[in-house]
């Protein structure tokens, strides 16, 4: 993963840009050193370089050393040896105190452009041309801009300021040269002083509970390898092999530096961590430039002398500043990854909050619409109940009015009948009295003719009495016929009226045909009544659609397809020119005509004959039966009225 990150950083180097306040403050250093071909190395000596001109931005031209086979082999062997010594020292816990110092106090982000450029310059200046091709493939480094936790939470931006070139003194730069004067070699120490505005809370380490990867940043870069006395000078660059090994070692080790310390490192546990990496690398700004350069030399001397005194043979290795650079660079990469994840989480939370607000607004709108629809439904329900109440009240009022009207008519008819009966009785009584008086007078006058006259009067009396009785029975028969007609017009049961008529016929018309007619009335009409002509018309209109549908289905029934085709065919209406073809529409037309003429029996017979042999025969059977009952009852009523009329005339 580290190799992938290094390659990505290298590929993004071309699109990076320098901040506006750092564009004119980049500085480049070059130096040369002379060495003889004898192969003996002297102690490292610093050669001061004059201050670079502030007005000139372009770096001075540097003549690269001639590529030699021996030089390349020395660089490769020295790099491998330093990397192995560094790994051994790291695994044994010798570097814990330095790692703890580096990872605890870093709180601001590293400037990616400055770090990348310094690595490239050191790479091109220190690596010979023979080795440069192999190191360029794996040594490309790029760092992404990072934002610390304090900047993400508080929105504070920290600017990285470099010292102007005019303020840099020659004491800031040291060079390693050998005592050999015949073979020229060159090494470059590129140092940059970075001033970071850090708050007091960050300087004092106010957040110990935060991971060191989040708050750590690399603040300085030192590309100088200090050789051990007696060895040839070796320039160590940020090569891909050492970086890869160190990254694997760091990933395999625990994150907490204190956990790496062994019981044997009792002295190292007592060492206090410095305030920041700037103080450790002597890169923090001071009042005087001379004191800074002297402290750099002392620090290098102490570090050089500390390495030979490390525990056992494996710890006797080079602890160069390049190792710290790699660790700082790895810590910066981890911090960038952590910070990028933190920023992604913030962006995701913001988008989630926006979506939540959007859906909450939509939910509120939907709830408001739902409440409006509920209110509308309640209003419509109230109106419907009110209309139902009005309709029920109107129906009840009409029923009461019709019942009152019927009662009034019945009372009027009974009163008229009673008056007519009383008049007839009075007339009969008067005639009887007069007849008796005449007979008595005739008996007094003619005793001889008394017996004859009495018989004649008796015969006349009996004749008139029979006439009066017959007249009275005819009146009762007419009243019964009227009552039967009224009951049939309402569709009510006629059993009561039939019983009354049979009572009237028992005394005078025992042998008449009326008894047979009344006994032939259907039992359903007597007990339940018959439908009126209007009701029969309404029921037939209701049956028309069903009649059209079931007339196309055989008596045994059909499946879903038969019913579907019958439904479609029944919905299509065609005007039939010839009504004698026996189609369902012609049958319906004939029945309508018969109903309009009042011929119920013919209508029932026509309908029954028209739907015979189809499924509709079962549907119309009830209507045909009711129509025939009505027809029979009306025929009996017509016969009764005709008989009463004939009797009254004779």
Curated annotation (Swiss-Prot):
Residues 35-74, 571-650 are mitochondrial matrix. Induction: Accumulates in the mitochondrial transmembrane lipoprotein (MTL) complex during phosphate (Pi) starvation. Disruption phenotype: Altered mitochondria morphology leading to the presence of several big mitochondria with a round shape. Altered lipid homeostasis; reduced levels of digalactosyldiacylglycerol (DGDG) in the mitochondrial transmembrane lipoprotein (MTL) complex during phosphate (Pi) starvation, associated with the accumulation of phosphatidylethanolamine (PE) in mitochondrion. Residues 345-369, 396-430 form a coiled coil. Residues 26-74, 121-168, 239-267, 284-304 are annotated as: Disordered. It is a multi-pass membrane protein. Residues 1-34 form a transit peptide. The keyword Repeat does not apply. Component of the MICOS complex, a large protein complex of the mitochondrial inner membrane that plays crucial roles in the maintenance of crista junctions, inner membrane architecture, and formation of contact sites to the outer membrane. Plays a role in keeping cristae membranes connected to the inner boundary membrane. Also promotes protein import via the mitochondrial intermembrane space assembly (MIA) pathway. Involved in the maintenance of mitochondria morphology. Binds to glycerolipids such as cardiolipin (CL). Component of the mitochondrial contact site and cristae organizing system (MICOS) complex. The MICOS complex associates with mitochondrial outer membrane proteins. Present in a large lipid-enriched complex called mitochondrial transmembrane lipoprotein (MTL) complex made of proteins located in the two mitochondrial membranes, including the TOM complex and the core components of the MICOS complex and containing at least digalactosyldiacylglycerol (DGDG). Binds to TOM40-1. This is MICOS complex subunit MIC60, mitochondrial. The lineage of its organism: Eukaryota, Viridiplantae, Streptophyta, Embryophyta, Tracheophyta.
């Amino acid at each position: 993963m580290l190799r992938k990150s290094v390659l990505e950083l290298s590929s993004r180097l071309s699109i990076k840009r320098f901040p506006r306040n750092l564009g004119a403050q980049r500085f480049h250093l070059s130096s040369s050193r002379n060495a003889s071909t004898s192969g003996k190395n002297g102690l490292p000596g610093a050669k001061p370089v004059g201050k670079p001109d502030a007005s000139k931005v372009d770096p001075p031209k540097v003549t690269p050393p001639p590529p030699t086979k021996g030089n390349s082999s020395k660089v490769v062997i020295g790099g491998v040896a330093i990397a192995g010594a560094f790994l051994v020292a790291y695994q044994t816990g010798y570097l814990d105190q330095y790692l703890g110092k580096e990872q605890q106090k870093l709180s601001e982000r590293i400037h990616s452009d400055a770090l990348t450029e310094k690595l490239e310059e050191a790479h091109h200046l220190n690596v010979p041309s023979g080795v440069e091709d192999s190191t360029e493939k794996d040594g490309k480094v790029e760092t992404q801009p990072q934002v610390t936790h304090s900047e993400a939470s508080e929105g504070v931006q920290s600017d990285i300021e470099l010292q102007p070139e005019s303020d840099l003194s020659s004491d800031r730069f040291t060079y390693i040269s050998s005592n050999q004067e015949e073979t020229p070699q060159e090494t470059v120490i590129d140092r940059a002083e970075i001033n970071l505005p850090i708050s007091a809370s960050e300087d004092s380490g106010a957040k110990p509970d935060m991971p060191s990867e989040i708050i750590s940043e690399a603040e300085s870069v030192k590309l100088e390898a200090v050789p051990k006395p007696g060895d040839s000078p070796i320039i160590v660059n940020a090569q891909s092999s050492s970086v890869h090994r160190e990254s694997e070692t760091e990933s395999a080790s625990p994150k907490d530096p204190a956990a790496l310390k062994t019981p044997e490192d009792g002295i190292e546990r007592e060492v206090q961590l410095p305030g920041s990496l700037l103080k450790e690398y002597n890169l923090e700004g001071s009042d005087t430039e001379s004191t800074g350069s002297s402290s750099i030399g002392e620090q290098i001397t102490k570090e050089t002398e500390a390495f030979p005194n490390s525990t056992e043979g494996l710890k006797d290795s080079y602890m160069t500043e390049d190792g710290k650079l790699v660790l700082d660079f790895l810590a910066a990469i981890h911090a960038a990854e952590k910070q990028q994840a933190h920023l992604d989480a913030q962006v995701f939370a913001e988008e989630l909050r926006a979506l939540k607000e959007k859906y909450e607004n939509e939910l509120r709108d939907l709830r408001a619409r739902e409440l409006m629809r509920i209110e509308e439904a309640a209003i419509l329900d109230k109106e419907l109940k009110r209309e139902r109440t009005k309709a029920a009240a109107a129906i009840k009022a009409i029923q009461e009015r019709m019942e009152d009207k019927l009662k009034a008519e019945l009372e009027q008819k009974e009163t008229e009948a009673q008056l007519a009966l009383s008049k007839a009785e009075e007339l009969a009584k008067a005639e009887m009295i007069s007849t008796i008086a005449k007979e008595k007078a005739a008996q007094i006058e003619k005793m001889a003719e008394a017996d004859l006259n009495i018989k004649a009067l008796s015969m006349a009396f009996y004749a008139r009495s029979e006439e009066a009785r017959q007249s009275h029975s005819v009146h009762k028969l007419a009243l019964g016929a009227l009552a039967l007609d009224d009951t049939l017009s309402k569709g009510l049961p006629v059993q009561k009226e039939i019983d009354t008529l049979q009572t009237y016929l028992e005394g005078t018309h025992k042998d008449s045909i009326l008894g047979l007619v009344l006994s032939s009335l259907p039992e359903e009409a007597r007990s339940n009544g018959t439908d009126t002509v209007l009701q029969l018309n309404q029921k037939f209109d209701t049956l028309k659609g069903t009649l059209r549908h079931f007339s196309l289905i055989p008596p045994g029934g059909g499946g879903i397809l038969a019913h579907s085709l019958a439904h479609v065919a029944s919905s299509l209406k065609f005007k039939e020119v010839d009504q004698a073809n026996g189609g369902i529409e012609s049958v319906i037309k004939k029945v309508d005509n018969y109903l309009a003429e009042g011929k119920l029996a013919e209508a029932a017979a026509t309908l029954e004959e028209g739907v015979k042999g189809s499924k509709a025969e079962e549907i119309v059977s009830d209507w045909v039966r009711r129509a025939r009952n009505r027809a029979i009852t009306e025929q009996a009523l017509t016969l009764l009225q005709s008989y009463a009329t004939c009797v009254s005339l004779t």
